[in-house]
């Protein structure tokens, strides 16, 4: 699992940052990529990476401001040009209006896609759930309807304790599979084995939370609780003047983001959606000003790739679920 930041700026493209789009690379987990927001020129940014548009199976749209959606029609069209077919559908999760926006752009431009396009209008709670991942959405507080997302990887089953089985002279074969599945197995010599005694502890799945355009609100902590990575908008830095601008425009400051990460007990905070003013010394200060609140903080740059590793120490009862 990796995060690739295709755009880390806010409002409009700048010389150093494109507008918002983040790829969650799940190539090992499900041979797929998920995008979170698709700002203008996202597909140009993708050309600078190893990402393949055909691998994108889901797009999550936080809200309908242009710097988060103007890249959608072009990306969808290019995905079609690059050979996506009826067996490679794409699902877009977003607020009311995203379907109308996309369909209008495709209709007016007479663009016909070669693959199925599915729309899911966001509601609070679980918006996607399968055997490997669950996605939870919650409303944010912005100038228009806006959403945050919590991506939960399902826990990984524990490993079969093969050395223990061999030490007890238990023959390999179908029995191993039954024990790994947690079943009780009767051996020819009369022994009865409980699979749970021969499987190591489950490995906790990873959690990544995306908080994009919003002012501070209680749902942020709910979505970010015990997250491995919290990706949080930081349109403005620390300071009273910045705080006033953030309140006026319904955005967050770097201090807001750090406080949210601390309260939620997240592992890492990544700041994104930066105003174009933050370059040079101001950019350095953006991080240094908040590390006393949340030390494990970094600022994303365009095309950064961040690994989200599995934890080595695991617990079946870890209360990280919302």
Swiss-Prot record:
Its cofactor is Zn(2+). Pfam families: Lactamase_B (PF00753). Zn(2+) 1 binds at residues 63, 65, 142, 213. It catalyses: Endonucleolytic cleavage of RNA, removing extra 3' nucleotides from tRNA precursor, generating 3' termini of tRNAs. A 3'-hydroxy group is left at the tRNA terminus and a 5'-phosphoryl group is left at the trailer molecule. Keywords: Endonuclease, Hydrolase, Metal-binding, Nuclease, tRNA processing, Zinc. It is an enzyme of class 3 (hydrolase). Zn(2+) 2 binds at residues 67-68, 213, 273. Transmembrane segments: none annotated. Binds 2 Zn(2+) ions. The keyword Nuclease applies. PANTHER family: ZINC PHOSPHODIESTERASE ELAC PROTEIN 1 (PTHR46018:SF2). Homodimer. This is Ribonuclease Z. It comes from Leuconostoc citreum (strain KM20).
């Amino acid at each position: 699992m990796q995060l690739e930041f295709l755009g880390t700026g806010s409002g409009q493209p700048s010389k150093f940052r494109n507008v918002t789009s983040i790829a969650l690379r799940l190539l090992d987990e499900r041979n797929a990529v998920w995008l979170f927001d698709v700002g203008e020129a996202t597909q140009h940014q993708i050309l600078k990476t190893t990402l393949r548009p055909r691998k994108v199976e889901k797009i999550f749209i936080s809200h309908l401001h242009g710097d988060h959606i103007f890249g959608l029609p072009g990306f969808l069209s290019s995905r079609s040009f690059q050979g996506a077919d009826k067996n490679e559908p794409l699902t877009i999760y977003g607020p009311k209006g995203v379907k109308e926006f996309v369909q209008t752009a495709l209709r007016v431009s007479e663009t016909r896609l070669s693959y199925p396009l599915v729309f899911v209008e966001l509601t609070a709670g679980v918006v996607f759930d399968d055997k490997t991942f669950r996605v939870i959405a919650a409303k944010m507080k912005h100038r228009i309807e806006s959403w945050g997302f919590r991506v939960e990887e399902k826990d990984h089953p524990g490993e079969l304790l093969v050395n223990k089985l061999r030490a007890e002279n238990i023959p390999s074969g179908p029995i191993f599979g039954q024990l790994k599945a947690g079943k009780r197995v009767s051996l020819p010599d009369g022994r009865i084995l409980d699979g749970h005694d021969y499987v190591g502890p489950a490995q906790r799945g990873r959690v990544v939370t995306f908080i994009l355009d919003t002012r501070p609100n209680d749902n942020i902590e709910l979505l970010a609780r015990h997250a491995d990575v919290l990706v949080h908008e930081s349109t403005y830095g620390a300071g009273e003047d910045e705080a006033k601008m953030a309140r006026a425009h319904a955005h967050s400051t770097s201090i807001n983001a750090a406080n949210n990460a601390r309260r939620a007990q997240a592992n890492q905070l990544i700041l994104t959606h930066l105003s174009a003013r933050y370059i040079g010394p101001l950019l350095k200060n953006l991080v240094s000003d908040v590390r006393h609140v949340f030390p494990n903080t970094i600022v994303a740059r365009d095309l950064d790739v961040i690994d989200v590793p599995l934890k080595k120490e695991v617990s079946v009862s870890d209360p990280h679920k919302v």
